[in-house]
Every structure is written in C-alpha cells, then in structure tokens.
UniProtKB/Swiss-Prot annotation:
Chief location category: membrane
Protein name per its UniProtKB record: Putative sugar uptake protein BC_0219
Pfam families for the chain: Sugar_transport (PF06800)
Source organism of this protein record: Bacillus cereus (strain ATCC 14579 / DSM 31 / CCUG 7414 / JCM 2152 / NBRC 15305 / NCIMB 9373 / NCTC 2599 / NRRL B-3711)
Protein's cellular compartments: Cell membrane
Disulfide bond sites: none
Keyword Membrane attributed: yes
C-alpha cells in the first residue's frame, strides 16, 4: 500500500503535460492556467494543514515559485518545438543531473566511496538516456536547428527547476510549509513572464486542471516520504516519464519511427535506472 502511495506522484505528474496539450493553448496560457490550479489547491491545503509561516518561509517559498514558473514556461515552449515525448525525457534527465551535481557540491551528499560510484554511474546512465531519447531519424527528422533551440530552451527550464528545488532545501523548509508561498510565487512568476502574450483566455482556465494534478502529486509525495523514505519515493516519482513519453505517442498521436521508439524506450529505462541509483545514494 505504501509503494502504491509513492507511485501516485508519478501518475499525477506524468499526466501534467498530456493534460496541458489536450486542454489546448500555447505555452503562456498553459503556464498561467497551471498556476491558477496550483494556487487553488495550495490554498485548500493550507486551510486544512495550517503550517506555521515565518517571514523566511514566505520569502524563500515565493522565490522558489518564481523560478518554477521560469522552468515550466520554458518546458512548455520546448514541447511546442520537440513534442511531449522528447521534451519530458530530456527535461527529466537534465533535472536529475543538475540537482545531483549541485547536491554534491553544495550539500556534500556523496561522502562515501559507494555513493560516489553509484552517483557517477547514475549520471552516466541518465546522460546516455537523454542522448537516446533525442536521437533523430532520417524518416522523421526535426527541422534544421529545431533540436538545438529546444535544448537551449530546456537548459533555461532546468535552471529554473534547479533553483526552485535547491533554495527550499538550502533554507531547510519542509514541503507542507512551502506549498502556499510557492504557489503564490508560481502564479506571480507566470503572470510576469507571460503578460506580453495575453495568457488569460479560455485555455488558461482549462489548464487549471493540470495545476490541480501538480498539487495532487505534491501532496502524495509529502504523504509518502515519511512512509517509504527518500531513497524509495524519489526514484518512484521519476517513473512518470513513462506515462508522459508513451502517453504522448499513444494519446497525442506524436509520430515516431520504429527506431526512435526503441531508443526512447531504452532512454526512458536508463533515466529511471539512473534515478533508482540516485535514490540509493540518498538512503
């Protein structure tokens, strides 16, 4: 039962991009819509849990949310260039590598020979997985420069997600306390980043559903952490890439050749394998 609970964040987060694309709209209205849903969810959660909110929690949580908005809007812009199935695997891989390297440098996470070996193998697996999932095929090649533009946009996205995660940990703020300030920062950040593109339309309202999914995934992660621990919950939460990747191919009709499907499957397995090894370094 506890493992099932730990899998629920992956199910929720794995469906976010699928729902966003299905709801329609561009990256800007999708991002604003997600933050509307997330803010609504966070407000409800705060009413029921009422964690203590110090000035540090309010400021740091707000800043964290701003950077989440930077990460999300650029991830969705990449989806427009590369599609969900390619974007989500590369993005997940980049985030895992970035947070792991920063964790080693800033928090001295890998302090034993075993964790150094496991962590190094994990990063290599993830990097190879990212390369596999981004391979083009002559029959289904991206337009010239499209992959490069997408990767550059994902680097900005990864930076946003990295700060979103790291700043909360740097100030040792627990997830329950951070939810509401983060959601406020997410909404404000989304509005600031998208205001020139008139994001408030029917698609923004529709995409509130994806924001509710984000909040639901967050809730289940917080509930599962004390039950199964970080070493188990962390890699399980990353398995959502399987849902996103193959859901995009099956339900969104993204076209892939047989060769691409094989490499996407292998890449996804390698990235999840890397996430499992990273989870072991946190045990």
């Amino acid at each position: 039962m506890d493992i099932l609970l730990a899998l629920l964040p992956a199910i929720a987060w794995g469906n976010i991009l699928l729902v966003s694309v299905k709801m329609g709209g561009g990256a800007y209205s999708q991002t604003v819509g997600m933050t509307i849903g997330a803010l609504f969810f966070a407000t409800i959660m705060y009413v029921f849990t009422q964690p203590a909110l110090t000035m540090t929690i309010l400021i740091v949580g707000f800043i964290s949310g701003l950077f989440w908005a930077l990460g999300q809007v650029n991830q969705l812009k990449t989806v427009e260039k590369l599609g969900v199935s390619t974007t989500v695997t590369i993005s997940t891989g980049m985030q895992l590598v970035a947070t792991s390297i920063f964790g080693v440098i800033a928090f001295r996470e890998w302090t034993t020979t075993t964790t150094i070996i496991l962590g190094t193998i994990a990063i290599l697996l993830i990097v190879v997985g990212v390369v596999f999932t981004s391979l083009d095929d002559k029959e289904n090649a991206q337009p010239p420069g499209q992959l490069k533009k997408g990767l550059l946009t994902l680097i900005v996205s990864t930076f946003g997600y990295l700060v979103y995660v790291i700043i909360i940990r740097w100030y040792n703020i627990d997830g329950w306390s951070a939810i509401l300030p983060q959601a406020v920062g997410m909404f404000v950040g989304a509005v600031v980043l998208t205001s020139k593109h008139k994001p408030f339309n029917k698609y923004a309202i529709r995409n509130a559903l994806s924001g509710l999914l984000w909040g639901t995934g967050n809730l289940f992660l917080l509930l599962s952490l004390p039950r199964v621990g970080v070493a188990t919950s962390f890699p399980l939460s990353q398995t959502g890439i399987v849902i996103s990747t193959f859901g995009a191919i099956v339900f969104l009709g993204e076209k892939k050749t047989k060769r691409q499907l094989i490499f996407i499957a292998l890449g996804s397995v390698l990235i999840i394998g890397g996430a499992v090894l990273l989870g072991m370094t946190k045990a």
